[in-house]
């Protein structure tokens, strides 16, 4: 994948973001965190990354590793690390639903 050729379409980006926000994933609910992992793994696989699921401690859910091959293997790569939990308890979407107001979006896990 040539990252320089990726187009930026804010509507497409928001369409991809919304399922992530709508997937409630409290920190200590491993089933909920793993549902978020499933969404992320699917999206990364669609972009061409091989996915490795890494079981961690049973009280926090798994980790995933996605790798994108660098077109020039002798060049340094890029490491991106993130988390899939939102801290908020299940049911938070009822009080704090995903919404868009102009150029901003709101919901659990985003501003």
Predicted region positions:
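Acidic/His- and Gly-rich active-site-bordering loop/insert found
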Residues: 2-111
